[in-house]
Design a protein with these regions (language model features):
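N-terminal/domain-start alpha-helical segments
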Residues: 1-123
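Short, Lys/Arg-enriched segments at the junction into DNA-binding effector domains
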Residues: 2, 110-172
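Short glycine-rich hinge loops at helix-strand junctions in the catalytic core
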Residues: 24, 165, 205
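Residues within helix-turn-helix
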Residues: 106, 172, 188
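DNA-binding patch around the recognition helix
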Residues: 122-126, 149, 192-194, 198-223
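N-terminal positioning helix adjacent to the helix-turn-helix/winged-helix DNA-binding module
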Residues: 153, 186-188
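DNA major-groove recognition helices of helix-turn-helix
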Residues: 157-158, 174, 197, 201
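Short helix-coil junctions and helix-kink-helix linkers
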Residues: 177-182
Length: 223
């Protein structure tokens, strides 16, 4: 899953990004509101972490513009402002959660998981497709009750597919979940990851189906 982090303090951005990457997420870092507004308008994120006090365009305006476009991506606001009126303002604009600075990285990670659990899993702890199970808190896939050994890229592809049941995902859509803004997104490499995943899933009652010219679908099999 791909997360956008918008924070103008370089050291804080680096530490938060590293913590999220260590937890297994793909993270894009931006440092101003205009860049964030552009990215949120063109990229597909599972979650946005948005500082209020951004240069060029503050976090409140970025959030307001995001919701005005009809985007429902969950947003966690970071703020050094402790006033209730600021938190209320952000929540009224469409923020999903607030975290006041300074904060512990463990609390931020817990809030990220809670937001993703609500938005991706509908409040559930796990997603299932056949005998493939994904646990959001541990970010582990199991097949027939055995842990799957996946690379970070394979994990990102499989997360994207299991989070969108019944939906055919194009190579470009999958690539957007695998590669960050500072990486060259390769749709062709998705074929390689899908091939590897098929090998790892073949003993279970789940498969990745190819729809030529459209993309891939993760589905349970009857046998």
């Amino acid at each position: 899953m791909r997360i956008l982090l918008v924070e103008d303090h370089p050291q804080l951005a680096a530490s938060v990004s590293q913590a999220l990457k260590n937890a297994g997420w793909t993270v894009d870092i931006l440092h101003d509101g205009v860049a964030a507004d552009l990215a949120l308008g063109s990229e597909d994120y599972a979650l946005a972490i948005l500082d209020v006090g951004l240069p060029r365009m503050d976090g409140f305006e970025v959030l307001a513009r995001l919701r005005a476009r009809g985007k429902t991506v969950p947003v966690l606001m970071l703020t050094a402002r402790g006033e209730v009126k600021d938190r209320v303002h952000g929540l009224n604009l469409g923020a999903d959660d607030y975290l006041a600075k300074p904060f512990e990285l463990s609390e931020l990670e817990a809030r990220v998981k809670a937001l993703l659990r609500r938005s991706v899993l509908g409040g559930e702890q796990q997603l299932r497709c056949g005998d493939l199970v994904y646990d959001l808190d541990t970010r582990r896939f199991t097949l027939l009750d055995e842990s799957l050994n996946l690379t970070s890229r394979e994990q990102a592809v499989l997360e994207a597919m299991i989070a969108r049941p019944g939906r055919v995902m194009s190579k470009e859509q999958l690539a957007s979940q695998v590669f960050g803004l500072d990486e060259e997104a390769s749709a062709d490499s998705i074929e390689i990851y899908v091939h590897r995943l098929r090998k790892k899933l073949e003993r279970g009652s789940v498969r990745i189906v190819t729809f030529r010219g459209l993309g891939y679908l993760l589905e349970a099999t009857s046998g």
